Amino acid sequence: MHSTVTHRPKPARSKDGELRHLMNLTAVGVTLAGVILLSVILYAAWAANSSASAREIALFGNAVNRSILRLLNEQKSVAWWDEAYTAITDAKPNTEFLETEFGIFLSETYGHDIVVILNPDNKPIFMYSGGARRSADDFERYRNVFAPVLAEIRQVKGRSLRLRPDLFGANQKNYRTIGSPLQSARWTGHLLTVDGAPAAVGALTILPNVDKSLLKPGRPHVLISVNTIDEAYLQEQGRSLLLSDLTLGKTANTNSEYAGMPLETDDGKIA
């Protein structure tokens, strides 16, 4: 008797089955490629939006620096002036001159919301806001706000405010009229919260600009001005930055079409 070895051969794969398998693989590959492409597109869109937001934030920061420069230049137009220096440093300051040339001029010509002049002892000799003169008691509500700015002017050691570029100082290099008094001049500008709103705050020492013999020894008087950042300010900045929808809000805008950021002042607070 002979033994016989048998086996069941595997059925041959039909051409239709191979084609179906190939089509399935192709479909999976196309789907995977589509997912990858979509991910790349979404990432590119996210990266573009992030880059645009960062650029717009940088533009706004630069606009604030330019606003501080403008504020200091506006202050300089009256603070560095022989007649103003004499009116302030006389034994009895000329209050009518101060109201006209500092209070009314700076508020109505340039839109300064608060104007303050402090004597060498940091006591207010003049304050103007809301279209009227204010008392020394009115200044007390702002003393803590202005304290770090005044400390910089008086060169008190220890910086408590964010360092900003000195655009104003860079513009004084060609100033020859003031001469030696300019060497003792001090100025600073910052973004702070004043009366619950963000504001540009500028401080400048008061000097004669022609007659150097008028300059008295000791610490100088200081002019402080406040320019509140409100909707009108933002609209002006938005036009210059080509950001027509620039706005200020107390809460974050949840609209995905808008990019928002907290407005941090130079003392580290959120305005």
Feature locations, PLM:
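Positive-inside N-terminal membrane-insertion signal
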Residues: M1-G34
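Short, hydrophobic-rich beta-strand element in sensory/regulatory alpha-beta domains
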Residues: Q75, H112-I117, D245-G249
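Extracellular/periplasmic ligand-sensing ectodomains of membrane signal-transduction proteins
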Residues: A87-N94, L106-S180, L223-E236, N253
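N-terminal post-signal-peptidase region of extra-cytosolic proteins
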Residues: F97-F102
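Generic short beta-strand
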Residues: F105, I114-V116, G189-H190, G260-M261
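Generic detector of solvent-exposed, compositionally biased contiguous segments
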Residues: G158-V210, S256-Y258
